[in-house]
């Protein structure tokens, strides 16, 4: 029996995945977590074989949660299940040790295949993600994203700013003081060589970190 832990900050997504996997022979969802912190706690208690990990979550995001999880429990297999198809997310998560990467648009059959494949010691990457990574490997490296210089927390805050969240809103969601959020904000500006939230939003759109419509 393959024990699975589902990690996503949206209740409907967690519940939907759990229900879909309930009738699959050989799989058992042993728990659900809505943030990285709970994922790490439940993983210690439940000892799952496979963790289905979202990327963008309040508090500890999927990237940092994957790093910490595999540092303490290296035998666990992490499959990233997310809407984040554009680099640097796939590259960063795979470098952090994720065994699989798939989009939330995938069907049940693909998800089951991914779980069984990583449990067997192989990797699984959705076809569209694999094609994107393959194409990138042939591109000149000088076009790497400036966001590659940011930490996981800095990327999390940068994306929230780019999506028009104010300092107080970010402070409330991440349980940080406004002063700490502003410290991160100016550090992000310095690393990206920008001076305003508008420039950050434009840079994020240009490098595929957020949709232009948002």
Curated annotation (Swiss-Prot):
Residue intervals of the HTH luxR-type domain: 143-208
Coiled-coil ranges from the UniProt annotation: none
GO biological process, any: phosphorelay signal transduction system
Domain of life: Bacteria
DNA-binding region residue numbers: 167-186
PROSITE patterns from the UniProt entry: HTH_LUXR_1, HTH_LUXR_2, RESPONSE_REGULATORY
InterPro entries the UniProt entry points to: CheY-like_superfamily, Sig_transdc_resp-reg_C-effctor, Sig_transdc_resp-reg_receiver, Tscrpt_reg_LuxR_C, WalR-like
Response regulatory domain boundaries: 3-119
GO terms, molecular function: DNA binding
Keywords, alphabetical: Activator, Autoinducer synthesis, DNA-binding, Phosphoprotein, Transcription, Transcription regulation, Two-component regulatory system, Virulence
Record-linked NCBIfam families: PRK09483.1
Protein name: Response regulator GacA
